[in-house]
Amino acid sequence: VVYESSPYFAGTGSDSAQYFWNVRQELDADPSERAKMPPIQRRGKRPVISNSQTRAWVPYGFIVVHSSAPGTGLSQGCPTVGTRIEALAPKAVIDWLNGRAKGFTTPDGNEEVKAFWSTGRVGMIGTSYNGTIPFAAATTGVKGLEAIIPVSPNNSYYHYYRSNGLVRSPGGYLGEDVDVLYDFIHSNPDNCEYCDSVYKRSVMQARHDRRSGDYNEFWAERDLMNYVDDFRAATLMAHRFNDWNVMISQ
């Protein structure tokens, strides 16, 4: 089984600079308010949420499986951008593909769906955010995840959004931060108001610290290098040296 998980399958928000942070801010000063990004018009319906990877792998006899990351598309929960939730969600899918977890046709239904067609041997693949998720899944040590191919993955959100105690912006996205990425991927309109209140404002904007840019518990939770003790999947990783968005040091 070739498995790709993504926060992008159901659509994305605006990349207009008017919804990013104002970078003209002095160190140790409170940032100015950021304009709210318009809601995302969710696209995609079950059972087909993406055709990614199908042409590359299905002709060779592989089954391709897709899932939307937590808080995106038809997935439940809130987008947490880099926490253990994004590792445990694909782990649950792999557990289902191996018959260790139950799946149902609806979140609150009782009609079970079994992956009778799965051998239980899973490989994950993806680029950028879609490449970070396989790495995160592999840190759980889940049985059945045999190999991953992450292309330009981001394994540390601190190094993506901060640099040696300073706030930085990924290449090409001046003023972006972890809460901006949250808005960009939050394509589940059913949970937007709730998640904005209990997670974006109460956790992300309260703790990501645009005043100093220092490393703290918020960023430590989003550093995959802190969770590699159980990593067991064979890995083929690719990265460009001149990538100024997700840099090789991340």
Task: Outline where the language-model segments fall.
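Structural cue for short, hydrophobic secondary-structure segments
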Residues: 2-7, 66, 96
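Accessory cap/linker subdomain of secreted extracellular hydrolases
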Residues: 7-43, 47-55, 59, 87, ...
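Catalytic nucleophile-loop/oxyanion-hole region of alpha/beta-hydrolase
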Residues: 44-47, 73-92, 101
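Conserved alpha/beta-hydrolase
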Residues: 54, 58-74
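Short, glycine-/Ser/Thr-/acidic-enriched flexible segments
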Residues: 155, 242-243
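Short beta-strand/loop motif that positions the catalytic acidic residue
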Residues: 231, 237-239
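Conserved alpha/beta-hydrolase "acid-adjacent" motif
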Residues: 244-249
